[in-house]
Amino acid sequence: MAVKSLVFRRKFPLLVTGSLLALQPVAALTVQAADQFDCKVSATGGWDCSPLQNANANLPPRPAHTATSVSTAAAGSSVSGSGGETVEAEPTQRLVTESGGRALRSRSADYSHLDWIPREKLTAAQLAEIGPYCGGSYIEPVRPGMDDGAPSDESPTYVSAKASRYEQEKQIATLAGDVVLRQGSMQVEGDEANLHQLENRGELVGNVKLRDKGMLVVGDHAQVQLDNGEAQVDNAEYVIHKAHARGSALYAKRSENAIIMLKDGTYTRCEPSSNAWTLKGNNVKLNPATGFGTATNATLRVKDFPVFYTPYIYFPIDDRRQSGFLPPSFSSTSDTGFTLVTPYYFNLAPNYDATLYPRYMAKRGMMLEGEFRYLTHSSEGIVNAAYLNDKDDHREGFPDYSKDRWLYGLKNTTGLDSRWLAEVDYTRISDPYYFQDLDTDLGVGSTTYVNQRGTLTYRGDTFTGRLNAQAYQLATTTDVTPYDRLPQITFDGFLPYNPGGMQFTYGTEFVRFDRDLDENIYFNDDGSIRGKRPDASLQGLARATGDRMHLEPGMSLPMTRSWGYVTPTLKYLYTKYDLDLDSQGKTDLNKRDESFDSNQDRSLPLVKVDSGLYFDRDTTFAGTPFRQTLEPRAMYLYVPYKDQDSLPVFDTSEPSFSYDSLWRENRFTGKDRIGDANQLSLGVTSRFIEENGFERASISAGQIYYFRDRRVQLPGLTEKDLKRLNLDPSGLDNDSWRSPYAFAGQYRFNRDWRINSDFNWNPNTSRTESGSAIFHYQPEVDPGKVVNVGYRYRADARRFDSSRGTFRYGNEDDIIKQHDFSVIWPLVPQWSVLARWQYDYNKNRTLEAFGGFEYDSCCWKLRLINRYWLDVDDDAFLVQSEKADRGIFLQIVLKGLGGIVGNKTEMFLDKGIQGYRQREDQAM
C-alpha cells in the first residue's frame, strides 16, 4: 500500500512500496549479516530500524557504479553476483551520438521507449490530431501527479520498487526492479537505484525514464537531486509530446525550473525511424515554459549531412510566436533583377509585434519595408512603411516621379465604447508607378489605387449614424481619377413605435464628391510619350463635382403567418444636387445643345408589395427521407419615370442580372440613378432537407414581367448615346416585356461533393446572357483531396471603362468565356499533385496554369510548381497586361522550424484553388 511521508525541506521524505508490501501494512526489509537491519516506516514518516539476528534474504546487491556519463553496468563486461560469482554483462548500449539522427532501436524495436504509438494502434481522437502521412504519434501515458503544479521543494518524494535494502549507517536506500521516484509533476524510472538521504540525491541505472509535464527523457544512467528536482540523464533521448518533437544528447540536464540542457544535442520533428532533418548543436536549451529553444554552434543536417551552420539559433518547440528570421524568398524579374527578401520578425509582446522586410534588388538597390501590428482591449491595427532610394533611372522625367520611393499606411479599428466605433484605412505612395515597378510584402489590397478612409460610427438603439471621409490615390496612369467622398454623412434607422403593426424607417445621406483631374501627359515604359492621361478624355457632366443629399423615408406593414407573408411598402425618394462644372465640361454640353443646371433635385415615390408562401411535405427519394419545401414569391414594384440624364454619375453602376435581381428595389447601385419600374417579379424556390437538417438540394427560378419600357440608363448607354456611337439600342433589351429567365441551384451529392450553378437565358434574343457551373469536391473526413471544375459565361456586360470614364456595351472584349480547373490529389499518402488551368475562350489564351507536386511528411514538406500567368483583374475580368509571366516555385518547410524558401507559393495556391486553405488548416 502507499503511505505518504511528512514533507521535509532538506531531508527528502521517502515512501517505499512494492510486491513485498502487498499483504502487510509495513514490510520488513532485510539485508545480509553484519550490516543487516529490519527497517520499518515509523508513525512520524521516518525510518525505524533494528539489527536483524537471522537474515538470509535473497535480495540483489546494491549497484556499484560511479557517476560517469554512461552507466557502469552498461559499460563494463562483467559484474559480481550476489554470491560472489562473475556473470556476463548485457551488451554495451549504443550511444545516441552514433544514431545518425534516428532513435535507438536497441532500446525498443518499435520505439515504444519514446512513447511512440504506431498509427494502427491510435484511437480515432488521436488519429484526428495527426496528418494522414504520419506513421504514428507520441502519446504521453496517464500517470499519477502528471498535472501536479506544486514546487519541487514543497513536494514529497514517492518511491516504489520490487525489492529494497537500507544501510542505516550510510543512510543509503538500494532499490531494484521497476524503480519509480515521483516528486511533484516529475517522475523518474529505472531498473535499479541508490537513494542518498544525507545528500538528498538519487542515482538510477538501466532503462532510465524521466517524465515531466509533456516531456520524456530516456537514458542509461541518471542522477536526481530530490530536494529541488534537478536531474541529469546520460546517453539521453527525449520527446516533447504535444510538439511531436524528439532529439538526443550525450547527456540531458533538467534544472530546477524544468529547463532541459542538452550536451551535443539534436532536435527534430521527424518520426523515430527518420533522419530527414535534424538541428544539432553543442549546447541546446529547451524551455517548455516559454515554448522556445536555443542552440549554439548549430548545424542543420539533412540525412545526417550538414547543409547550414549558424553560431546561434532560437527556435520554437511549440506553436508560440518568437522573434527571429522568417523564411527568405528570392526571385528575378526584368524590373528589379535578382531580388532577395530576408524578413525578420519581432515578437515584442503578446499583443503587438513587428516585421522588417529588407529587400535587395540588383537593379534598384536596398528597399526597407516594415509592419507593426497591435491589439488592445479596445482597438486593433497595422502600421506599415517602406522606403527605397531607387538607382534605376528609366523613369527619369516622368510626371510625379522621384527617385525617393516610399509608402506608408495605417489600418485601425477602435471601439471607443459600446456604441462608438472609429476606423482608419489610410495608405499613401510616392508616385503612381510604385506598384508597377516594385513588389510589396505589406498586404496592400489593390494595385490600381490606394484607399484613404476614416470613419466614425455611432450605433443607437433605433438608428445608426456614420461620418465618413474617403479619398483614393491612383497607382496607375491609365485610369481616370476616382471621386473622393469628403465628407459623407449617413443617418439610418426606424421609429421605436409600431401603431397597428406599421414599421417606419428612414435613410439619409449627405456627401460631397470631389476630385482633381490630372490631364498631364504620360509615358510608355520605354520612355516614349503615350499621350494625355485619361482624365483629359472626360466630357460634359463626367467632369462635374458637387454635393448630393438623399432622403428616403418609408413605411411598411409586415403581415406574417407560418404559411406565408405579405409586406406592402411605400417610400419617398428625394435627391438634391448642388453641382460645379469646369469650363471644358460646359463647352462639351453646349456642343450637344445641352444645358447645365447647378441646382437640381429629383423626387420619386416607390411602391412595393412583397409576398411569399411556404409549403412543405415529407417525401422519399432513392430510399432517403426528405422534407421538400415549395416557396413561391411574388413582388410588385412601381417607380415612375423621371428624366435623369442631366444628373452626373458619382458612384452608380448596374450589376449583372441574376436571380437576386428579381427582388431589388433599384436595378442600379448608388443614388445617382433610380430605375423606373412597373413590373412584377415571380419566383419559386424548392429545397430538399434531410431529417438531420442537411440541405441536400435547392433550386430557384424566376422572371420579371415588365409593364413599361425601362428608360432610365447610365451615361453612354442611353438611346441617344448609343445612336451617336452607331450602336443598336435594342441590344440593351430595354423595351422587352419580360426579363431573362433566372435560375440558381445547388446540389450536394453528400457532404463531400457539391455543384453550384446559375443560369440566365433571354427568351427575347434566344441566347444565354450569363451563367456559371462550379463543381467542388473535398471530403469532410479527408480535406486533402480537392477537385474544382468550373465554367462561366457572360455576354451581357455593361462595364465602366475606367480609361475613358464612361460606360460601354457591346464590346467583344468584355465577353467572358472561361473554364477553371484545379486539383489537389494525393497519389500515395505522402505525395500529391497540385494543378490549375484557367482558360479564356473569347481570346483563345491561357490566363493561368500551374502544375507541380508536393511531398508531405510529419517532419517536412516540399513543393515544386511550374507556373504561367497573365495579370488579371478578377473584379473586371480583364487582363491588365498581355505579357505572360513564367516562374518555377520551390517551397521547403521543415516542420517545427518553419519554411526555408518559397513561402510566396502559398499566395497563388490559396487564391487559385478553392478548398486549399481548409486543407492546410486541417493539416495543421
Swiss-Prot record:
Biased composition annotated in UniProt, kind: Low complexity: 66-90
Specify where it is mainly localized: membrane
Keyword presence, Signal: yes
- Give the Pfam families listed for this entry: LptD (PF04453), LptD_N (PF03968)
The cellular location(s) given in this protein's UniProt record come to: Cell outer membrane
Q: Which GO terms describe its cellular component?
A: cell outer membrane; transporter complex
Q: Which GO terms describe its biological process?
A: Gram-negative-bacterium-type cell outer membrane assembly; lipopolysaccharide transport
Quaternary structure annotation from Swiss-Prot or TrEMBL: Component of the lipopolysaccharide transport and assembly complex. Interacts with LptE and LptA.
What does the UniProt record say this protein does?
Answer: Together with LptE, is involved in the assembly of lipopolysaccharide (LPS) at the surface of the outer membrane.
What is this protein's record name?
Answer: LPS-assembly protein LptD
Which organism's genome codes for this protein?
Answer: Pseudomonas aeruginosa (strain UCBPP-PA14)
